[in-house]
């Protein structure tokens, strides 16, 4: 059974066998939050004061950048931000807070030339350990978006050397070992090209699977598609049958990542389109991205607190095959996640004994509770309730 001919059924046959060999424990609820959300206007302005320290088991601050093999501190306010974030642990000592380096804007180029030589990698690793310890972080998340085929060895070596250094630091420290995680792609071609999965599985504590952005206004031909479908749609053929959470999770496990190290990403935002005709279903022709939201101000993209406003007067359809909703109002189409789809996704990950759920990101949920009339953090709370013990 070659990977090139792997379909959903044969993929899951192998995964079920693997799952029978693995046990489960308490689930993780890993919550990213972004340092640019503090610059948004109300009600989207998000600061550490908005964080409930008991909401998530792990918080990941996104993103720090690297320059000259060291993490950059932009200004004193960023140091103050680190202190405020990590002070949440005085209220909840069980909370783990990680620093994420990289991200979409930093891209792959940002990791060069640091990864290119053992000397520069060592300089970075020594500096990051010192940085994490000095600022009271519990670990590092590497969000290299994404290593290409030539770079996957660099990525593997960087992760391995970080893991070894974290272990060495732990043996001479009175503190717990620093955690090491990575934000990784959910695209099959990217998984094949970017990651030496079996090696990464030995060195990472867990992966944060970016199981969203499966469809958006960047695609050609430009047609509507859901941001994060749980399952394959009836119309999906060929490569598009891989563009769903179920396939991505199964493929990572098939490639050698233990299920308990897979933390499945669930988005608190949707992707939107401007419809090109009267057709409104999934796969309907679109003329471009949807109109920008009033707070996030990015075309083709809406945070959940903006989606709630959009839903007033919109027609909502729940996709029975993909198990997620979309909404249409006028010529605007948005595919998003709601409380029900969150609960369905958590049941899916529990059935597979995954490590838990990851939220991208808590600052795009209705964290104030003022936009959706569902209380603060309705989506994250739905995930938390469904997961049970953390």
Swiss-Prot record:
Single GO cellular component term: extracellular space
Tissue expression notes: Highest expression in chondrocytes, followed by synoviocytes, lung and heart. Not detected in spleen, pancreas, and liver. May also be expressed in developing brain and placenta.
Source taxon at top rank: Eukaryota
The GH18 domain, residue ranges: 27-390
Statement: the UniProt record of this protein carries the keyword Disulfide bond: yes
InterPro entries: Chitinase_II/V-like_cat, Chitinase_insertion_sf, Glyco_hydro18_cat, Glycoside_hydrolase_SF, Glycosyl_Hydrlase_18
Binding-site residues for chitin, renumbered to this chain: 75-76, 102-105, 146, 210-213, 360
GO molecular function: carbohydrate binding; chitin binding; hydrolase activity
Positions bearing carbohydrate: 35
Localization in the cell: Secreted
Signal peptide: 1-26
Disulfide bonds: 31-56
Keywords, alphabetical: Chitin-binding, Disulfide bond, Glycoprotein, Hydrolase, Lectin, Secreted, Signal
PANTHER family per the UniProt record, alphabetical: CHITINASE, CHITINASE-3-LIKE PROTEIN 2
Protein family according to the UniProt entry: Belongs to the glycosyl hydrolase 18 family.
Function per UniProt: Lectin that binds chitooligosaccharides and other glycans with high affinity, but not heparin. Has no chitinase activity.
Record-given protein name: Chitinase-3-like protein 2
Organism: Homo sapiens
Name of encoding gene: CHI3L2
